[in-house]
A protein has these predicted regions:
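Extended alpha-helical targeting/anchoring segments
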Residues: 1-292
Length: 292
């Protein structure tokens, strides 16, 4: 269907109160023919989750979660791949592949599963280290062509509610809730300590130990109301081609990025470090030439 009167944010707001585990991934670069899609994933039916450094939880459609003990962290990619291979998909239409995928995240601390020597002692995980879900529905919006696709995974024993989704997509009602800050902002590190770490990072770059380093610290802020307003503000003050908002019930993850960090296409994985970005012009040919 045509998508010129629909927005990913509007659709997400209409669906999230009616369907559990709804997540949003936005491709906001509507001037580019590639990677100009947004996705709203609705109703998780299966998935895998590394809850702690020692525990992997997997779930199949219609079954109770199964816990797998992680004996060797280096086998986590193998365990996840083994789980993914338990699924088969039919159909060769390109748009169908939007639904035939697992959506989720891999946290920074999960790097120890690939390279255990990279990190020191374990930090307490506030959220699962990795979480990926297969969804019954994926709404895909191609901003370049103004097309909207409602993709559904037909799973035995799982009733379809696609008609309800379509009615909500077409609805004019967009529920919104207030948001307010409470208390003062706090950080886990004083300004002076943070600046000392920045100086160390600069020194490492000058010595040639690294060509890029990201220095960060955590902030905390109390609030009341709907966290989605924070995401809406983020996409307004920091508009980026790639944005995401994952609402998992007991925690939320949101963010924006100027570049796709990893692209997998035709069996090849390509990494795009942030240090290699370039100014976008809006012209595909010029942008492609600058990237090369």
């Amino acid at each position: 269907m045509l998508a010129d009167i629909h927005t990913p944010v509007g659709i997400y707001l209409r669906l999230r109160d009616r369907f559990r585990d709804t997540v949003l991934l936005e491709g906001a670069d509507g001037h580019a023919s590639d990677n100009s899609c947004s996705f709203i994933c609705v109703n998780a039916v299966a998935g895998a989750e590394v809850r702690t450094y020692d525990t992997l939880e997997v779930k199949l459609p219609g079954e109770k979660p199964e816990t797998v003990k992680i004996e060797d962290g280096r086998r986590v990619p193998e365990l996840l791949w083994s789980f993914l291979k338990r699924f088969t998909a039919e159909g060769d239409v390109r748009e169908a592949s939007f639904a035939q995928a697992f959506y989720g995240y891999t946290s920074y601390d999960a790097v120890r599963f690939a390279e255990p020597s990279r990190l020191g002692g374990r930090r307490e995980a506030m959220i699962p280290l990795m979480r990926y879900r297969l969804y019954q529905y994926v709404i895909a919006i191609n901003h370049f062509r103004d097309e909207l696709f409602l993709c559904e995974n037909h799973i035995e024993g799982l009733p379809s509610e696609s008609d309800l989704l379509l009615s909500l997509i077409r609805s004019r009602d967009v529920p919104q809730y207030p948001f307010a800050l409470t208390g003062a902002e706090t950080s886990d590190m004083a300004d002076a300590d943070y600046l000392r770490i920045v100086d160390r990072g600069i020194a490492h770059c000058r010595r040639g130990d690294v060509f890029q380093v990201v220095i960060s610290r955590s902030f905390r802020q109390g609030f009341t109301g709907d966290e989605f307003n924070v995401y809406r503000t983020l996409r307004s003050i920091n508009p980026s081609p790639y944005l995401f908002y994952f609402d998992y019930g007991d925690y939320r993850i949101m963010g924006s990025s100027p570049e796709s960090q990893l692209i997998v296409r035709d069996g090849r994985a390509t990494v795009h470090p942030i240090a290699g970005t370039f100014r976008r012009t809006g012209d595909d040919e010029t942008d492609r030439r600058e990237a090369d």
